[in-house]
Design a protein with these regions (language model features):
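A structural boundary/capping signal
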Residues: 1-143
Length: 143
């Protein structure tokens, strides 16, 4: 049985891998691959790696879904507000014992999704490659 500690271990190990934007890695704004295949990566690469590792330890695809969101407003290193389009982010949602946890490369530990100040955009339908708008999404995982 998968535990919260298993999520923490995978979150910690994957988050230790180096961050590098797709523009730096590939000269393109977006390229999705597991971070272990690249040696470094951005948010989608981290979360694909976590998804893969969770499947390897026995988690069902129906318990996992990728989600896009806009993260909280913040200032850049020069003190300027980061525009909304540049706050677009991808995380992994994990259903564990009826609680939805967010695995996010910006945080060291899994977080309950209700605690994050994100504006949810699209959610993957669990176990599929289909996405739905968050406003219309079934927030439960169901089997």
């Amino acid at each position: 049985m998968i535990t919260l500690n298993d999520l923490r271990i995978i979150q910690t190990k994957v988050n230790l891998l180096p961050y590098k934007s797709d523009a730096e890695n590939f000269g393109t704004p977006e390229f999705w691959a597991r971070i272990s295949e690249l040696g470094s990566g951005d948010c989608d690469d981290y979360e694909l790696e976590k998804y893969h590792r969770l499947i390897l330890i026995g988690m069902k695809p129906s318990q996992l879904r990728l989600a896009t969101c806009f993260v909280e407003e913040h200032r850049d290193s020069e003190g300027q507000w980061v525009p909304k389009k540049d706050r677009y982010h991808l995380v992994l949602l994990v259903d564990l014992n009826g609680i939805t946890y967010v695995l996010d490369n910006r945080y060291p530990h899994p977080m309950e999704w209700e605690l994050l100040p994100y504006e949810w955009h699209k959610l993957q339908i669990p176990g599929t490659q289909t996405w739905e708008w968050a406003a219309n999404a079934d927030r439960s995982f169901g089997e």
